[in-house]
């Protein structure tokens, strides 16, 4: 077992967040080290679009390099985050004895990052907001490729249920 390990990784104060719209998110961690006088003397942050690359120290999106610092909150300095993209990140730290320790891989996913990236269309019933009966909306579509993952963004003032292929999604 490692004596020192970076844990509790957060991006903008959230664990593995989805839909962040901050081009410069804050990445933070805690140092798990019970030894007396324990401290971090340096850190390195790796950010990648591939978890294996991040795990193998390949930060093709960002590699901070080794920074001599006890800082545990770092603002992502680059301007290269793309909308609707999942990023994987980890942090390496060096302890008071110069030993390197590595965090587990965490992730964050960007949102629209600006209204110019919005491609959806609102679905509504064009009735007065005070119209009482609850409308049902149905959208039928076929995909051209096999779906690897998908996300539905739903905005309602009250209750909703989402079904895909006849199966209820969520609670």
For the regions a protein language model found, what residue spans apply to each?
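Short beta-strands within extracellular/lumenal beta-sheet-rich domains
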Residues: 131-143
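Aromatic-lined ligand-binding clefts that engage carbohydrates, nucleic acids, or primary amines
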Residues: 141-144, 148-166
